[in-house]
């Protein structure tokens, strides 16, 4: 006799991964509930991660653009804005995103339950509601999409009003003149751009020997140079010994013997999965030291009826990939298998000022693989559209096979890089000989556009062949 469950599936978390899973499930006729511990849907991506930080970056980049534009150089004063003013812009975007995503669930008759969930047994959850009551609910299957949070080492006092992580920095309540950013990963570099763009002194502490080592080295070097040129002080191969919070700021003692003092500290070195409150031990699931779950190609955990997607499974930890992971997991959950899969070359967008975006292999990878590749480059300063809008800083680089002309990687540094990259990505994904750098020579681009960089880079690369 079939078991009677409250739901066919329960999704824990309403970020990109949870949303992708929930929408995929209801579209296939499943009875679905989504549990969200926050008071609004959207998860960390919407409320204290991707959306607010990118809204901040956009506002700051527009201020920089105004102050550097020769059209306004006759003005006697620079345009400035407080951190609080810029946060208001981010709040407006967050509210729009929340209303839109709430509408998705309502239109698709997907139930939203608010509170904190943990497992009682393999098919039962306890839901601690915000009013203090506790409910139990059962489901045949589950999708864990509870995201991640900033890593907090035990010897750093995050309760101090001058010490922030990448979540709490969005509630910055004073106007710093000098900030220390510990951790030069994607989040650290993005906030270094934001603060420097607001004319705040920035010390960027990097525990490694170069910035964003997973990038093509030219892109990493371009960012390093741009930071240096704008006044960001980068300190490589450094680790903290002790962090002291005081009334007027923060003192950081480095293991190298150096001491730094600033108005505040942003600790942005690592993240951990939000799995510690799920009581996974009650169902026999274990996480790694970062609170992350291991899954197979269909996003099943060690328990076949429990799936996991998004930051909680680690790499690539991208909102874009998390949504697709949720969609694939939903297909596998209902049909027993998934015909869809993540693409091999997932694009990376880093929202520094200027942006960086990459897809495919780097020069270092191709050299190590002994692939006979060639390089085509286009400098933004040579493009009419870039000259018109004053976006002269930047480059597009295409890596392609010398013999087959197949595009192997595309790397872009400059404003709108995360948009520009998708043109090349679309060609890279073509099958049956469609992936060729010659496409960019044989097609017609609108003029003037930034997309024209592909034609310039393609000609540059093909001219190197002999």
Curated annotation (Swiss-Prot):
Major site of localization recorded for this protein: cytoplasm
Compartments, as annotated in UniProt: Cytoplasm
Free-text cofactor note: Binds 1 FAD per subunit.
Signal peptide (UniProt feature, chain positions): none
Record keyword Glycoprotein present: no
GO biological process: 2-oxoglutarate metabolic process; NADP metabolic process
Protein residues bound to FAD: 36-45
A single GO cellular-component term on record: cytosol
Alphabetized InterPro entries for the sequence: Class-I_Pyr_Nuc-Dis_Oxidored, FAD/NAD-bd_sf, FAD/NAD-binding_dom, FAD/NAD-linked_Rdtase_dimer_sf, Pyr_nuc-diS_OxRdtase, Pyr_nucl-diS_OxRdtase_dimer, STH_gammaproteobact
EC number: 1.6.1.1
Record's keyword terms, sorted: Cytoplasm, FAD, Flavoprotein, NAD, NADP, Oxidoreductase
Family: Belongs to the class-I pyridine nucleotide-disulfide oxidoreductase family.
HAMAP family to which the protein is assigned, alphabetical: SthA (MF_00247)
Protein name: Soluble pyridine nucleotide transhydrogenase
Organism name: Salmonella paratyphi C (strain RKS4594)
